[in-house]
Amino acid sequence: LFLIMFVSIIIFSFTGWGGFLERLALRVLLIPIVSGITYELIRWLGKSDNILSKVIAYPGLKLQELTTKEPDDAQLEVAIAALMTAEGIKPDEKTIGELLEIGAKNLKEKDIDTYVLDSQLLLGMVLGKDRIYLITNRDKEVSHKDEKEYMALIEKRSKKMPIKYILGETEFMGFDFDVEEGVLIPRGDTEILVEEILSIIDEDKELDVCDLCSGSGAIGISLALNRKNIKVDEIDIFDIPEKVTKSNIVKHALENRVKFIKSDLLEEPIKLGKKYDIIVSNPPYIKACEINNLMDDVKLYEPHTALDGGEDGLIFYRKIVEESKLTLNK
C-alpha cells in the first residue's frame, strides 16, 4: 500500500496539465503502469538487502506492523466491552461464592496454607463486609469493578505477600494495629512477652516504660492499653516504623501517655537524660546467615532490618544491655 502511494505520487506529479476530466482519464490509464512499477519494486525489495531497499521498505513494514499487531489484554477488554455494549449484552457478574472458590483455588495452587481464610478476608476487604456476611450471601452478585480489585489482591497474595500487609492491619493482644511493608508484623508468640510484663506491673502503679525497636508499636501500646497509669516511649530509628507507630498511638487515643522517639537504640534517651522503670524490646535476633532460609512471606517482604541480628543474632542484645545501664532506674 505504501509503495503504491509512493509510485502514484511520483507518476501523477507529471500529469498536472489539462482540465479535470483529462487529468482523471490520464490517471486511470496510468493505473496499470503504477501497478507494474510497484510490483517490480516489491520483487526487488524482496531480493535486495542493501540500505536503499531497507529505507524504502521501512515505512511499509512499520505500517504493516501497526495494522497487524495483536492487541494486548487491555485493548481486548475494551473491544469486548464496546461490542457487548453495542449489542446490548450485559456480561454476567460472578457471585460471592464463585469468587471465593476462584480465589481459594488460585491460592491453594501457590501453596498458601490459609487459602480459604485469605480468600474470604480479601473479598471482605473489597466489599467492606465481614466473613459471616460472605458465608450467608454466597449467591449475591459482585460488580465487575469489585471482582477486578479482588483478583488483583489474590494475585498479590499468590506471590506470598503477607495477608496482613495486604489488609493493612493485624490483631495483637486483642487489639487492632495498622501495619505496612517496612514494619515487622507482630507475632502471636510476642504476646507472651507482653503478658509477662503485665504480670509484674500492678494495675494502679505509675511507671515509665520504654518499647525499644518498636516497629508498629504493638508491644508498648498493648501495655498502655492494659495498664492505665503507665507512660510509654516508643523508640525506633526508621521512618516507616515512626509513621506506623504514630498512627497506632492515635488509633488507640493514647497521645497523652505514649510518645515516639526516633533514636538508634537508646542513644536519644541517654542524651535527654531519660530514665525508665522497664525497658521491653523484641529486637532483631536471627543470624545473618539464616535470613535466606526463612519462608518467602518473611524474607521477601518483611524488613531485614527487623530480622537480621548479625553474625550470632545477638548484636542488638549486647548493645541494649550496655545502654540500658544508663537509662534504667535502680
Which functions belong to the PLM regions below?
Residues 311-330:
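Conserved Class I SAM-dependent methyltransferase catalytic core
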Residues 4-28, 35, 39:
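Juxtamembrane "helix exit" motif at the C-terminal ends of alpha-helical transmembrane segments
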Residues 189-293:
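Conserved SAM/SAH cofactor-binding pocket of Class I
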Residues 285-315:
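Mobile active-site "lid"/loop adjacent to the S-adenosyl-L-methionine
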Residues 93-150:
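A short N-terminal interaction module
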Residues 125-199:
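Conserved AdoMet
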Residues 1, 42-91:
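Polar-ligand-bearing catalytic/cofactor-coordination segments
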Residues 122, 160, 190, 219, ...:
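Residue-level signal for inorganic ion chemistry
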